Amino acid sequence: MINPNPKRSDEPVFWGLFGAGGMWGAIIAPVIVLLVGIMLPLGLFPGDALSFERVLTFAQSFIGRVFLFLMIVLPLWCGLHRMHHAMHDLKIHVPAGKWVFYGLAAILTVVTAIGVITL
């Protein structure tokens, strides 16, 4: 018999954030590390393409704030989701693990939002 009131799961929301964070961490983050962490210190950029003033102006623009927010938050959700499931796979039972890991991710998301808004 089909249950007319199936139990809804919140897992798709967390899987969506995990997937978005994984894709961001695989595609966007390595490019930023290459540009800012390797090429910039070696002086491989023309002139002041990434001068402090230009980077600060970008970071204080709307699109820059959104980019910084996503650059921090999406990999954060991915990592904490991975840690939550790794603890389960290793049979290390964290009391209220879903609340601990996803709650920490939510708190850090709010902290990041406040930090990016006040930049």
UniProtKB/Swiss-Prot annotation:
It is a multi-pass membrane protein. InterPro entries: Fumarate_red_D (IPR003418), SQR/QFR_C/D (IPR034804). Gene3D superfamilies: Fumarate reductase/succinate dehydrogenase, transmembrane subunit. The keyword Transport does not apply. Its main location: membrane. Keywords: Cell inner membrane, Cell membrane, Membrane, Transmembrane, Transmembrane helix. The chain crosses the membrane at residues 25-45, 61-81, 99-119. It comes from the Bacteria. Pfam families: Fumarate_red_D. The keyword Transmembrane applies. The lineage of its organism: Bacteria, Pseudomonadati, Pseudomonadota, Gammaproteobacteria, Enterobacterales. GO terms for cellular component: fumarate reductase complex; plasma membrane. GO terms for molecular function: succinate dehydrogenase activity. Belongs to the FrdD family. Part of an enzyme complex containing four subunits: a flavoprotein (FrdA), an iron-sulfur protein (FrdB), and two hydrophobic anchor proteins (FrdC and FrdD). It comes from Salmonella arizonae (strain ATCC BAA-731 / CDC346-86 / RSK2980). It is found in: Cell inner membrane. One of its GO terms (biological process) is fumarate metabolic process. This is Fumarate reductase subunit D. Two distinct, membrane-bound, FAD-containing enzymes are responsible for the catalysis of fumarate and succinate interconversion; fumarate reductase is used in anaerobic growth, and succinate dehydrogenase is used in aerobic growth. Anchors the catalytic components of the fumarate reductase complex to the cell inner membrane, binds quinones.
